[in-house]
Amino acid sequence: MINGEWHEFSPAGIARVPEEHGVYALYDGDTLIFYGRSEGRSSSTLRGMLLDHMLGTMGRRTRAVTTFRYEVADLPAIRQMELLEEYKRLNGRVPRCNERLS
């Protein structure tokens, strides 16, 4: 689980996110719906990825997002895999918007 501060899924909330790489969790109310990551291209920072979700360029599956959390990580792909494995162990499945990715 990503611990830390909850942020409103809004331009103001996203503006407080650093231009770094890491992982993020998107929520519909109090339900976790997606674990994502940012890495690779310099434009694919946490802030950039969250803005892409907000603008709809990541598809319609995360349109219901109301809040998010994030974590700066040196190895985002590995951290995302750890988060997905933990969620699946506890819930018997991955978050609903990660289903097509698993």
Q: How would you label these PLM feature ranges?
A:
Residues 2-5, 50, 54, 87-88:
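Generic low-complexity, intrinsically disordered sequence content enriched
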Residues 90-101:
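Coupling/hinge elements of helicase-like and P-loop NTPase modules
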